[in-house]
Amino acid sequence: MSETYVLKADLRTRVGKGSSRELRRNGQIPAVIYGDKQEPLAIAVSYKEIFYKIHGGGFKTTVATIEVDGKKIQVLPKDYQLDPVRDFPQHVDFLRVSAKSVVHVNVPVHFKNEEAAPGIKRGGVLNVVRHDVELIVPANAIPEALEIDLSGLEIGDSVHISAVKLPKGATPAIQDRDFTIATIAAPAGLKSEENAEGTAEEAKDGE
């Protein structure tokens, strides 16, 4: 599980575009805390802290504690909006969570031991079908990433979700099939040779 962190926040008494612009001028951005059958709570958080958390990776898989109005609220970032031109954060949605909360979260996939995959050594290409996997997982057990070992994989081999070790209590959100996460694809040169051989064989059969 990722290391948790603390965010200090202020309550927002005003909402709307004018209020949001004023917050940004003062180094803050608007945010909201929702969920757990409670009323949404409008807050303002540090622009700088959110910027580094978002661009540092793992933002949406790490539980945080927000300190606001004398309270400590455990949350999981669920969504954020960026400026379409400059990638600056403009708004964040936080979901209230507790030790008993079970959440849907997209966890990034990391691959290791590429050098130990014979298929890649022979020039095969790692074709990533899914860069992240949606899990249903306890909020206190969200992994930073799913590690996939490529050792021993040959050209044409695939990695399916059934081969991935998941944290205790976690299940994939997609349950109706053993979906593919990655394959070792043949290099373009090898594909061309195979196609040429196949064409030659067909021509020979047609004689």
Swiss-Prot record:
PANTHER family: RIBOSOMAL PROTEIN L25/GLN-TRNA SYNTHETASE, ANTI-CODON-BINDING DOMAIN-CONTAINING PROTEIN (PTHR33284), RIBOSOMAL PROTEIN L25_GLN-TRNA SYNTHETASE, ANTI-CODON-BINDING DOMAIN-CONTAINING PROTEIN (PTHR33284:SF1). This is Large ribosomal subunit protein bL25. Part of the 50S ribosomal subunit; part of the 5S rRNA/L5/L18/L25 subcomplex. Contacts the 5S rRNA. Binds to the 5S rRNA independently of L5 and L18. One of its GO terms (molecular function) is 5S rRNA binding. InterPro entries: Rbsml_bL25/Gln-tRNA_synth_N, Ribosomal_bL25/Gln-tRNA_synth, Ribosomal_bL25_b-dom, Ribosomal_bL25_C, Ribosomal_bL25_long, Ribosomal_L25_dom, Ribosomal_uL5_bac-type. Pfam families: Ribosomal_L25p, Ribosomal_TL5_C. The keyword Transit peptide does not apply. Gene3D superfamilies: Ribosomal protein L25, beta domain, Ribosomal Protein L25, Chain P. Belongs to the bacterial ribosomal protein bL25 family. CTC subfamily. Keywords: Ribonucleoprotein, Ribosomal protein, RNA-binding, rRNA-binding. The keyword RNA-binding applies. One of its GO terms (biological process) is translation. One of its GO terms (cellular component) is cytosolic large ribosomal subunit. This is one of the proteins that binds to the 5S RNA in the ribosome where it forms part of the central protuberance. The lineage of its organism: Bacteria, Pseudomonadati, Pseudomonadota, Alphaproteobacteria, Hyphomicrobiales. HAMAP family: Ribosomal_bL25_CTC (MF_01334).
